[in-house]
């Protein structure tokens, strides 16, 4: 199964040069969502939709690859936190991989790093086979 991509937040974000995209791919036991660009109030809807869809469909492990993500504001953080709770209630989990320093710093400052399992990269995460 190849990756499926969702870009932008409506016509404005897509017309604005596609500042943010979410690519979904199934790998091993995980759904991998790769975030690219700038995640903020204006671009966040595709991430919210992807996370809600995969939690609703019963994904036990959602790995969010933040490697290509250059910026994340409080909107993106809140979406991830809400999705983490929804996944946990459904018997699954959301993990993060590849956070670059500016994004990692926001997680540290807010304390959100303490509630997510974080990995240096996707391959390291996929090699960790802890149960959901």
Where are these predicted regions, by residue range?
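Amphipathic alpha-helical interaction surfaces in cytosolic regulatory modules
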Residues: 40-116
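Short acidic-hydrophobic, aromatic-tinged amphipathic segments that line or gate anion-handling sites
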Residues: 117-121
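Short, ordered loop/turn segments at secondary-structure junctions
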Residues: 99, 122-123
């Amino acid at each position: 199964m190849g990756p499926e991509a969702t870009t932008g937040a409506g016509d404005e974000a897509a017309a604005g040069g596609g500042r943010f995209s979410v690519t979904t791919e199934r790998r091993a036991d995980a759904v991998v969502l790769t975030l690219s660009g700038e995640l903020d109030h204006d671009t966040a809807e595709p991430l919210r939709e992807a996370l809600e869809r995969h939690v609703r469909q019963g994904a036990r492990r959602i790995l969010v690859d933040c490697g290509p993500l250059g910026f994340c504001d409080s909107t993106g953080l809140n979406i991830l936190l809400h999705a983490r709770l929804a996944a946990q209630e459904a018997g699954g989990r959301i993990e993060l991989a590849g956070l670059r320093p500016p994004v990692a710093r926001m997680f540290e400052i807010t304390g959100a790093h303490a509630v997510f399992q974080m990995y240096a990269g996707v391959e390291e995460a996929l090699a960790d086979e802890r149960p959901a």
